[in-house]
Design a protein with these regions (language model features):
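FIC/Doc superfamily catalytic core
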Residues: 3, 8-11, 29, 38-52, ...
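Short, amphipathic alpha-helical "recognition" segments used to contact nucleic acids or chromatin
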Residues: 14-32
Length: 327
């Protein structure tokens, strides 16, 4: 076996490029030459690597990605994906106030049924979210995202109703937004990132997100990538509407890419979920260009990590059951 090529920094290029695997593969799939990829890695991440190192990395990392569906028969795989899609859709939309039950949601998605006594908007929201799940799965192999992907997902997830120019679908917010929470027995308003600063902050977010996209080696790093993407996206709240649903979808991209089932925030945990996000954001302050660290550490963040780990168990159990049934 030949010696592993080492960069000027003394670290093997395989180790240096590993966190950016998805990014490198995405550039290659877009037709970018290995020489141009090496230069792009230098500009984006300060990596001093040769084009030969990039070519070698691509050769040794060309194997098919693992998937949580591996080892499951085609029939059970289809049923498992339907179950996860319906659960994810139900819980995410229920957190936002949708009144359809999980059974209702499955009937709407599977058979296109209309549930008596439920609003048209409730039906539209679950169909839109399920389409969002499909979109997320469709862009997995890109290994990175661009603003256009986030805009496309927003157009899919937020029903295309008549809006004014200050509430655009598929574009960053044009008006400041915020939320109210209880603190010390009184109602307190907390702003999100300003509309003027959102485009630049989202550039930061997308760059940081892509750096984590393909560098996941285990469940712990998958959980960390999810928490980072989810909470930092919510801090910015880049759209006038749909931010929670998009955060819960986008944050699962690195999780799915690494071969794990998605993390689904259960609807019954809605109050805990909202409270922990609120408490964390109050603890670290409003994000801005002057205070642009995307995810400052806080004890409140540890609380969220523990909750997310618990919530993940639902889909992990679904997969384990499907694999157990296949034996």
């Amino acid at each position: 076996m030949g010696k592993e090529v080492v960069t000027r920094g003394g670290k093997p290029f395989q180790s240096k490029l590993a966190p950016y695997e998805a990014e490198v593969k995405s550039l290659k799939s877009d037709g970018v030459s290995v020489r141009a990829i090496a230069e792009e890695m230098r500009v984006r991440h300060g990596l001093a690597i040769s084009h030969n190192a990039v070519a070698s990395f691509l050769r040794t990392h060309g194997a098919r990605r693992r998937s949580f569906l591996d080892g499951i028969s085609e029939t059970r795989r289809t049923e498992l994906l339907k179950a996860i899609r319906a659960l994810w859709t139900h819980d995410s939309t229920a957190i936002e106030g949708n009144t359809l039950t999980l059974g209702d949601t499955m009937a709407v998605l599977e058979y296109g049924l209309t549930v008596k006594g439920k609003s048209l908007k409730d039906h539209q929201d679950v169909v839109a979210h399920a389409n969002g799940v499909d979109f997320v799965r469709s862009i997995l192999d890109k290994g990175c995202i661009k603003a256009e992907d986030v805009f496309a997902l927003h157009r899919i997830v937020v029903p295309n109703e008549t809006r004014d120019i200050y509430k655009p679908i598929g574009a960053w917010k044009r008006e400041d937004n915020g939320t109210y929470g209880a603190e010390g027995g009184r109602s307190v308003y907390m702003p999100y990132a300003s509309a003027d600063e959102t485009p630049e902050l989202m550039q930061d977010w997308i760059k940081a997100f892509n750096a984590r996209f393909g560098g996941i080696a285990d469940g712990k790093s998958a959980l960390e990538a999810y928490v980072f993407a989810h909470v930092s996206f919510v801090r910015i709240h880049p759209f006038f509407d749909g931010n929670g649903r998009l955060a819960r979808l986008l944050a699962n991209l690195p999780v799915l890419y690494a071969g794990f089932p998605p993390i689904v925030v259960p609807s019954e945990a809605r109050l805990d979920y909202i409270r922990e996000l609120w408490d964390y954001q109050r603890a670290v302050g409003v994000i801005s260009l002057a205070n642009r660290e995307l995810l400052p550490e806080s004890s409140r963040l540890d609380n969220l990590r523990h909750l997310v780990k618990d919530w993940w168990q639902t889909t992990l159990d679904l997969v384990a059951k499907a694999k157990g049934s296949a034996k």
